[in-house]
């Protein structure tokens, strides 16, 4: 979306050199924009122990106005690459591996297979607000809170988690973009 891809890969390699493990590379799958690059992303798992994750395009932020043709279910990857073998899931990602590959492939399906009921995530925004749901307007400021007050605020955020999203009916309720939320 922004910046230089070579710089991004240099950062990933620097993280590896620093001893970070279980690196995940997320990419939003968009029909007629980057679906011709799926094989390139999959090939990264052949030589690196990374998890390359494909996320379905969600109607939030600037993407909410995009045409529906941009939406491509990530399960399309399974149709195009039948050699992918399913392995144990991890969080919200269904995981696969190419035969002989070092890394894995994750498919995250917020649109085609909603997983809200199993979501155990909360997020803290760059400006210090807790969000119980990626798509909710509800936020709790954590700035200046300590000890019991902080614990109570986090618990409130967890208890406010909705049972599901409404993305198939309308765009996300949050006015924030993913990079503001921490997604």
Question: Where would I find each of the regions flagged by the language model?
Answer:
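Radical SAM/AdoMet-radical enzyme domain recognition
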Residues: 1-55
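Auxiliary Fe-S-binding modules of radical SAM enzymes
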Residues: 47, 57-183
């Amino acid at each position: 979306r922004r910046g230089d891809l070579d710089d991004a890969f240099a950062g990933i390699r620097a993280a590896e050199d620093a001893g970070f493990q279980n690196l995940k590379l997320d990419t939003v799958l968009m029909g007629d924009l980057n679906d011709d690059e799926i094989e390139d992303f999959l090939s990264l798992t052949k030589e690196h122990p990374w998890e390359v994750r494909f996320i379905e395009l969600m109607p939030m932020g600037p993407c909410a106005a995009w045409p529906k043709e941009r939406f491509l279910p990530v399960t399309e990857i399974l149709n195009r690459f039948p050699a992918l073998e399913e392995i144990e899931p991890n969080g919200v990602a269904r995981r696969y591996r190419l035969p002989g590959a070092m890394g894995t492939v994750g498919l995250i399906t917020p649109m085609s297979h909603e997983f809200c009921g199993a979501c155990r995530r909360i997020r803290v925004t760059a400006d210090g607000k807790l969000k119980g749901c990626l798509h909710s307007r509800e936020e709790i400021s954590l700035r200046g809170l300590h000890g019991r007050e902080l614990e109570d605020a986090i618990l409130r955020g967890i208890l406010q988690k909705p049972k599901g999203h409404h993305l198939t009916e309308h765009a996300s309720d949050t006015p924030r973009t993913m990079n503001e939320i921490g997604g």
